[in-house]
Regions:
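Glycine-rich helix-loop-beta junction characteristic of Rossmann-like nucleotide cofactor-binding loops
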Residues: 65-70
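Generic preference for hydrophobic
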Residues: 63, 77, 99-100, 206-208
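Short gly/ser/thr-rich secondary-structure transition/capping motifs
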Residues: 56-64, 132-133, 187-190
Length: 251
């Protein structure tokens, strides 16, 4: 079975890398145009990856709480980070977004070139308080421009089922912006694990909260709520994955 998964993952990677090179090079010709135009162009690559991994590796997904999304008001997404999958899939689930990411990622050939077209909030983690201030100021600016902002408060990809430390940056932005906040949990790491070449077939469960009203909440209070919600729904996502694994073995 793992041999089949390996060759299916090879096929996925060939398609992903080939189209990444194509989109990142052609995307440079969209630089003179608006951010909306650049985003729309690169957005097709992200959506392709979601479809391609389903066709080649059998990685599907279903969303719980899609009805909670208000497409008319830009929101802040504080999401679980387990895999590369969510960076693609969120572009199929939510409206136009700006990502908060490590500045070093923009130096990665092809991938970084494409990301630079999307006006990300690229921070230097070593800058400490300066990086937090940048996250808040640029995040507020993007939200005011009508773009959603995606923050992974754990700061890095975590193993499936393991909750990392919830950093304060996303909560500080939520407190300052007073924008609706959506919490997102999923179990993508069960099927597309961190640092693993092989993708396992299965269905990723994505949980989206109702928008939180943070107008009267401090950053600390928001952070506590984020940690509590993610912990609870991480357990739900893990239980769902375990149930599917048991059914798979029985069959």
């Amino acid at each position: 079975m793992k041999i089949i998964w390996f060759f299916r993952s090879v096929l996925f990677s060939i398609g992903q890398i080939t189209t990444l090179i194509l989109f990142s090079v052609l995307g440079q010709f969209t630089r003179p145009f608006s951010f909306a135009t650049r985003y729309q162009f690169m957005h097709y690559w992200a959506r392709f990856c979601v479809v391609w991994v389903r066709w080649t590796c059998g990685v599907k997904y279903r969303v719980h709480g899609a009805e909670n999304i208000n497409n008319n008001t830009a929101g802040l997404i504080l999401a679980r980070h387990e895999s590369a999958w969510e960076t693609f899939a969120f572009q199929a689930i939510f409206p136009r977004q700006a990502y908060v990411l490590k500045r070093e990622l923009l130096k990665v050939p092809f991938f970084g070139w494409g990301m630079a077209l999307l006006n990300p909030i690229a921070i230097d983690r070593a800058a400490g308080r300066k990086a937090l201030n940048q996250l808040v100021s640029e995040g507020v600016e993007r939200l005011e421009q009508g773009d959603w902002v995606v923050v992974f408060p754990e700061g890095t990809r975590m193993p499936a089922g393991e909750l990392g430390k919830i950093n304060i940056g996303g909560a500080m932005l939520a407190s300052k912006a007073k924008a609706p906040v959506y919490l997102v949990a999923h179990n993508a790491g069960e099927f597309w694990p961190k640092n693993s070449f092989i993708k396992r077939p299965g269905c990723i469960d994505v949980y989206i909260s109702k928008p939180l009203d943070t107008a009267e909440m401090s950053a600390s209070e928001i952070n506590q709520q984020v940690e509590s919600w993610l912990s609870q729904h991480l357990s739900s996502a893990q239980a769902s994955a375990d149930a599917k694994e048991e059914i798979h073995h029985k069959s």
